Amino acid sequence: MSKPGGHSRHGRRDGIDPVLRSRARRRALQAVYAWQISGGFAKQVIAQFAHEQAHEVADLAYFENLVEGVLSNRAELDTALTPYLDRSVEEVDAIERAVLRLAAYELLYRQDVPYRVVINEAIETAKRFGSEHGHTYVNGVLDRAAVEWRKVESGASGASGA
């Protein structure tokens, strides 16, 4: 529903609800993590989490896009992340690895999402689900990657500053 002036009830012209997007990212993280651990089939993981998500208000289409995007582009995402890591992708903690893959997908394939939003969401997700200092690692990797991947947006300065 729009308010006068063309803004949605969420205060954005594009109608995107940031809260629902955040929930979708958290659920996508859980789905990618489950896929990494179980080695399950992408469609099964998406179907399971989409069914569970039906009971939680979230952006289901965005959730599905994130999970399908990460799972179908895993090799490319890992290759893109490798120069910014201090170890192999597989040696990165499973939660931080899932966070990095999701953020890399958004930074590389979802140019409609500002890089600062991607990085800040990744940091908050890593704080919530990751190891004690995992968010610091995620921030460092994504700050460096965003400068290269989103040159026009990030300019020569650092990325998030967080």
Swiss-Prot record:
It comes from Xanthomonas euvesicatoria pv. vesicatoria (strain 85-10) (Xanthomonas campestris pv. vesicatoria). HAMAP family: NusB. SUPFAM superfamilies: NusB-like. One of its GO terms (molecular function) is RNA binding. Pfam families: NusB. Keywords: RNA-binding, Transcription, Transcription antitermination, Transcription regulation. This is Transcription antitermination protein NusB. Belongs to the NusB family.
